[in-house]
Amino acid sequence: MEEANNHFEGNMNIQQVNPTGVNNINKNNKKVELKRKVTMNHYINVTLDNMGFTRYHLLLFLTNALFLFCEGMNEIIHIILLSMIDEKHDLSNYHLAFMNSIEYFGYSISTLLVNYITNLIKRKYAILISVFVSLLCTGLSITSFNFIFASINRFILGFCFGILDILIYLNLFESLPTKIRGFVSTMILLFFPLGEFALSLTCYFKLKEGQMEVNYKFMLLFPFIFTCIICLSAIFLQESPRELFFGKQEYEKGAESFKKINEFNRDESNKNKFNFGDPEVEKAANDISIELGIMPNQDNHEAQNENEFQDNIKDNKNIQKSLLRQESNNNIFKMARLRQLFSQEFLRYTLLFWILGSFSGFIFYGIHFMLPATAPKINKNTFLDLVLFESMEIPPNFFAMLLIENKGLGRKNTIRAGFIITFIISLINIYLGETILLFDCLLKFSLTIPLNILFVYSSEIYDSHIRTLGLSLMNFWKKISSLFSPFFMSYILTKYGEFSTHLCYAPLLAICAFGSLFLSIETRGRALDEIIILDK
């Protein structure tokens, strides 16, 4: 590991040096940096692909699945809690709207802070603390039904969920082999609607009239038990090697993380060991660098340049000062990544992800809010309605799992097709001139597919050093829009009627469909952290 650290530090220490003149400094610096990045990334990808899907990946998968299952159940529990507090205190519509939104507000705040939090402490510690606090909040939910207490409790719970949503997912996502990354990442998202569906079904069969408080406490047992299991499993999680290498530039700790993962897998084979000195991997990385034009096709060219660079360091005080500034910049780089999202490479995708995430989130939760308004025409039983509504999110998740790795469609074309089809369904509904439950269901069905794949696609586009920030900010805009969606839809519903909501959906869906055409990079089957480099 010490050799690994020295290997890459040696490459980084020559970034500001050039013996031939000022005009070539930036070009050579960029080539050395790209060569270093491609080489290191190739080592990581070879190691992960050789590992396959191991016991450690299963631990990550089950932890993520249980968390999303719990989060889904908490959505239904929130509905029961609102009904119960309203029954006890006869709340106004303002108070109901406030409490309905407070959890989403906590979630939104935490998505803004999650990158800052992971700069201060390890991901593992952030996950453990958030799981433990959410466990306390779930337990305390049993004891009191006071409006203020319940609001604070739901805010804290939403705050923890916002952190866990990003970090648990990324720990799994960044460790997956390339071939199954999209399939597994999309499969995980299935467990949120499954949690909603399972608890809604349980409520339908088990809840008794006139015993709402007893029923509520009984239902809280399920997320409480599952959260206890998540807390135990989180103890065995390791830091993401990719985050350590690229996000924090801690190369020795990254290699140590690979070692601990192999120990957890009880794997003694050489193929899964992270070995910087593997000549085959080194040669493959060099071939990639030559193909990209990062380095010339000369075996000793880079070694000669390194010797010349190091000789210049000893004789040039300005170069030494430049290296010190570079080291200082690396230390503050972790706190200034927002600018990277708006760099030339990522600007288009950052803006598109924010627009697509916020608009589709607004529409999705608007449909979620509107469905209960049309469902009573079919069935008056609340939880049976919820069973039907939540079941609509399950089939499109299976479609997303199949389509995301399809050679003909891939990520970007599936997102495009999903938004275009959803827009067409909205136009048909407008043409018919009335709100039909079937079309609302189809709208929710078709929108779920691009929304889920967009989550995976954005994670693949961003490099590791800005992935947490990029994904959390997209989630922030999505959650903020979903927070205001019920208020806006309630106003539209009251003032203009049910059908008017579709007049709001159509233009937003048109923007999403048009915007998705500018997603030019296909990420299927491609290694992380080199997608943007290869498409420059």
Where are the model-predicted features located?
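Transmembrane-helix signature of 12-pass secondary carriers
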Residues: 2-21, 26-259, 291-296, 319-536
